[in-house]
C-alpha cells in the first residue's frame, strides 16, 4: 500500500496560514518608491531588492516586498531568513539576468534560503536571457556548465507558496527546490527553446510535501525532474512540451543518495517530448531505492517514449555500460495513459539484471504509434502486473541490447 500522502492537509494548512496573515495589515516595501530601484533595464536591482528584503524580513508583522511593473536588471541576489513574521514578494515586473554567462561565478542568480511562511506571486517574469549560454553548453564544457545559474533557487524553505510566476530562458534549470518542506508551486509558466540544454523546468531533491499544480512547462530538458530524497509529492494538471517529459531521476550516479518514495503524477498532458512518464537510473555507479511511484490519467501526444523505465540511462555514453544499475525499483504503476507515440516503442521497461523491478503495474493503457507500424512494448528483467485494456500488448517487442543515449 502506498504511504499516506500528507499533501492535502499540508496545502490546507498553507492556505490557512496565508489567509490568517492577510487579515493582518502587511507592511509594503516597494523597491522603487522606498529603495530607489529603477525600472530601466540597466540599473542593477540587487541592492534595492536586498535592502527591501532585509527590512521586510526584520519586521515583526507580515510584510510584502513589491517589485512594480517595468523591466529590471538584476546581477544576482541571495535572500536569506529566518524572518520574524510571514513574508511575501509581489513580483509584477520583468527581472532580467545579465545575458553574458561570464557574469556568473557560481550557479546562483535568485536564491531564497532558510525562510518559513513565504509566498511569492504577482504575475512577474524572471528572464534568464540564456541564449548565449545555450550555444556554449556542451557535454565537453563541464567547467562552463558548472557556473551557469539556476533562475530561481528555493533552499530550506518551510510552508511556502509560489503562484503566478514565469521563468523564461534560464541558463540552466529554471527552478530548483532543495531541502524544502510543504511547498506548493502553482499556475507557473516556464518557457525556453526546445534545443536549450539542461534547462529542467522544476527540479527537486531532499524535499517533502512538494506540490506542483496547474502549470505550463515548455523547455529543453525534463519538464519536471525528481531527485533523491524526495517524498510525498503531488504533480497534477501539468502541460509539458516540448521537453523531456516528467522524470524520476536520474538516480544512482552519486554515493549515499536518499530514497525517492510516495510520488503521484496525474491529470497531465505531455506533447512533442522525447519522453513521457519516465524513471531513469545509471548503470553501475551507486545504490538507491525508488518506490510508490504512480502515473495516472495522462495524455501523450506524439511522445517518442511515452512510458519508460530506463535502468541503463547513459546520456552522452558516459557510464559503466557493462554493469547493472544498483537502484532498486518497486511498487510503480502506470494507469489510464492514452495518446500517441512518435516511435513504435511506446512502452519500455529496461530494469536491472541484478535488482529486477518489483510490482510494476500497467492498467488501461491505449497508446497508438503515429506511423504505419503498430505500437510495441519492450521488457527486460520485469514481469508487469496487468489489467484493463492494454495497447500495446505488454512485453510484446524485442529488448534493446545497448544503454539508451537519450538525456
Curated annotation (Swiss-Prot):
Keywords: Cell wall, Cell wall biogenesis/degradation, Disulfide bond, Glycoprotein, Glycosidase, Hydrolase, Repeat, Secreted, Signal. It is found in: Secreted; Secreted, Cell wall. Glycans are attached at residues 182, 267, 272, 302, 331. It is an enzyme of class 3 (hydrolase). The keyword Acetylation does not apply. The keyword Magnesium does not apply. One of its GO terms (molecular function) is polygalacturonase activity. It comes from the Eukaryota. Pfam families: Glyco_hydro_28 (PF00295). The active site is at residues 221, 244. One of its GO terms (cellular component) is extracellular region. This is Polygalacturonase. The lineage of its organism: Eukaryota, Viridiplantae, Streptophyta, Embryophyta, Tracheophyta. The gene is G9.
Amino acid at each position: 500500500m502506498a504511504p499516506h500522502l500528507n499533501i492535502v492537509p499540508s496545502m490546507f494548512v498553507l492556505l490557512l496560514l496565508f489567509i490568517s496573515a492577510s487579515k493582518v495589515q502587511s507592511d509594503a516595501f516597494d523597491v522603487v518608491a522606498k529603495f530607489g530601484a529603477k525600472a530601466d533595464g540597466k540599473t542593477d536591482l540587487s541592492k534595492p531588492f536586498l535592502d527591501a528584503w532585509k527590512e521586510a524580513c526584520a519586521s515583526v508583522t507580515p510584510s510584502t516586498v513589491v517589485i512594480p511593473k517595468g523591466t529590471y536588471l538584476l546581477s544576482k541576489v541571495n535572500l536569506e531568513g529566518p524572518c520574524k513574521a510571514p513574508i511575501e514578494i509581489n513580483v509584477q515586473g520583468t527581472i532580467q539576468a545579465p545575458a553574458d554567462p561570464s557574469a556568473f561565478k557560481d550557479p546562483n542568480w535568485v536564491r531564497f534560503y532558510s525562510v518559513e511562511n513565504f509566498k511569492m506571486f504577482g504575475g512577474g517574469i524572471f528572464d534568464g536571457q540564456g541564449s548565449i549560454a545555450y550555444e556554449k553548453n556542451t557535454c565537453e564544457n563541464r567547467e562552463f556548465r558548472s557556473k551557469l545559474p539556476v533562475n530561481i533557487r528555493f533552499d530550506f524553505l518551510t510552508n511556502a507558496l509560489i503562484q503566478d510566476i514565469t521563468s523564461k530562458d534560464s541558463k540552466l534549470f529554471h527552478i530548483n527546490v532543495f531541502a524544502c518542506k510543504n511547498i506548493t508551486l502553482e499556475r507557473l509558466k516556464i518557457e525556453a527553446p526546445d534545443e536549450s540544454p539542461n534547462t529542467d523546468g522544476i527540479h527537486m531533491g531532499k524535499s517533502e510535501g512538494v506540490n506542483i499544480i496547474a502549470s505550463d512547462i515548455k523547455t529543453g530538458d525534463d519538464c519536471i525532474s525528481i531527485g533523491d530524497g524526495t517524498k510525498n509529492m503531488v504533480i497534477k494538471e501539468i502541460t509539458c512540451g516540448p521537453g523531456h517529459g516528467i522524470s524520476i531521476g536520474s538516480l544512482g550516479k552519486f554515493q549515499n543518495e536518499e530514497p525517492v518514495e510516495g510520488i503521484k503524477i496525474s491529470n497531465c498532458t505531455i506533447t512533442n517530448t522525447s519522453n513521457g512518464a519516465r524513471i531513469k537510473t545509471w548503470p553501475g555507479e551507486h545504490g538507491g531505492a525508488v518506490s510508490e511511484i504512480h502515473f495516472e490519467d495522462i495524455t501523450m501526444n506524439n511522445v517518442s517514449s511515452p512510458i519508460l523505465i530506463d535502468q541503463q540511462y547513459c546520456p552522452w555514453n558516459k557510464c559503466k555500460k557493462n554493469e547493472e544499475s544498483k537502484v532498486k525499483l518497486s511498487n510503480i504503476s502506470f494507469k489510464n495513459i492514452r495518446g500517441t507515440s512518435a516511435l513504435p516503442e511506446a512502452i519500455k521497461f529496461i530494469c536491472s539484471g541484478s535488482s529486477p523491478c518489483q510490482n510494476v503495474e500497467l492498467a488501461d493503457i491505449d497508446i497508438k504509434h503515429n506511423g504505419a507500424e503498430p505500437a510495441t512494448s519492450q521488457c527486460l528483467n520485469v514481469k508487469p502486473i496487468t489489467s484493463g485494456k492494454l495497447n500495446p500488448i505488454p512485453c510484446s517487442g524485442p529488448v534493446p541490447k545497448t544503454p539508451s543515449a537519450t538525456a
